[in-house]
């Protein structure tokens, strides 16, 4: 087999000579020529001479995998294969995806709408074991995502799960507790050690003098999705503020961060006064920030509003495992 430039296409013949298998991907919208000699059932030689053309996509779609190659992430990090829009042929996409872990980890895929597009997320049943090696292989080249839309190429990622660290954030305690060596969800007793306990101030929306669900720190398993040493916090009306804050760990795209706030140090440890973020002192915020990894879980409890899909991008852990398995995938 040759392409339009006359270059031979790599391939191999089966042992019995009955089948020839491609050894490389064919290009889109290309013409190939096949020549050769076959032996018929009567033992006579039969010449082969013909050509064919490959599909011409209307659009070649690039997918991306997170975490990226070489990253070290926390024990609540999901694998996300990002698409600009949800493919119509989801079954074909799913068949092209494999996850290999060392050691073996139970998990499953589900289609989730993310800010800026769609993704198919692979979440483990429980938190990842520390030190797990993960290989993701998305053989998407040649896969038709939707009519006329084909995968632009294969993508892979090899990443590692780092040390096990969980932040336990009980809004009624006015503190956060950072533990390591944790092996189970929602179980501080499964952790090997307590790294630090810091006074904190949470969202004031549950207070009797300022009832407002928009100002409640959401309860549930959050995931650290961004680490910013400096960030401008801007409130939306009627909550107008514009301030530069330091040591910011984003835990939800609804605007929740763990960050320093020197203006609430007197309230930290005794009163919840924030707009929904978890406020720490400058010293404690810096210490926590430097210990954090993307993908670390932050388990918030003690508030009246639960984290949900309405709160943004990474909400995979809001689903019990039985519900996750029943999501479209």
Tell where the protein language model's regions lie, with residue ranges.
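A short, structured loop/turn motif at beta-sheet edges
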Residues: 42, 129-132, 218, 252-253, ...
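Sec/Tat-exported extracytoplasmic proteins
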Residues: 56, 87, 138, 163, ...
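Exported/periplasmic cell-wall-interacting domains
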Residues: 75, 231-329
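Short peripheral tails and domain-boundary helices/loops at the edges of structured domains
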Residues: 60, 66, 165-173, 317-329
């Amino acid at each position: 087999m040759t392409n339009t430039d006359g270059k031979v296409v790599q391939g191999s013949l089966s042992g019995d000579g009955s089948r020839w298998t491609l050894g490389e991907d064919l290009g889109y919208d290309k013409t190939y020529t096949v020549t050769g000699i076959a032996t018929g059932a009567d033992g006579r030689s039969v010449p082969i001479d013909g050509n064919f053309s490959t599909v011409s996509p209307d659009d070649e779609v690039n997918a991306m995998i997170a975490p990226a190659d070489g990253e070290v992430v926390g024990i609540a990090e999901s694998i996300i294969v990002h698409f600009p829009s949800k493919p119509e042929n989801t079954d074909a996409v799913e068949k092209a995806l494999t996850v290999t872990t060392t050691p073996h980890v139970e998990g499953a895929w589900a289609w989730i709408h993310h800010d800026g597009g769609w993704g198919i997320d692979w979440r483990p049943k429980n938190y990842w074991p520390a030190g797990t090696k993960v290989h993701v292989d998305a053989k998407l080249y040649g896969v038709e995502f939707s009519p006329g839309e084909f995968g632009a190429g294969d993508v892979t990622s090899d990443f590692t799960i780092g040390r096990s660290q969980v932040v336990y954030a009980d809004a009624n305690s006015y503190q956060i507790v950072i533990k390591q060596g944790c092996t189970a969800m929602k179980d501080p007793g499964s952790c090997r050690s307590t790294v630090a306990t810091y006074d904190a101030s949470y969202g004031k929306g549950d207070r009797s003098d300022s009832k407002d669900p928009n100002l409640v720190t959401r309860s549930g398993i959050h995931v650290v999705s961004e680490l910013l040493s400096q960030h401008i916090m801007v409130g939306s009306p009627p909550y107008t503020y514009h301030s530069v804050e330091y040591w910011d760990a984003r835990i939800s795209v609804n605007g929740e961060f763990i960050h320093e706030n020197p203006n609430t140090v007197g309230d930290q440890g005794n009163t919840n006064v924030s707009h929904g973020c978890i406020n720490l002192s400058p010293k404690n915020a810096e210490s926590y920030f430097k210990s954090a990894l993307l993908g670390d879980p932050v388990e918030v409890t003690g508030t009246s509003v639960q984290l949900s899909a309405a709160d943004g991008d990474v909400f995979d852990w809001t689903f019990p495992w039985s519900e996750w398995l029943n999501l479209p995938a």
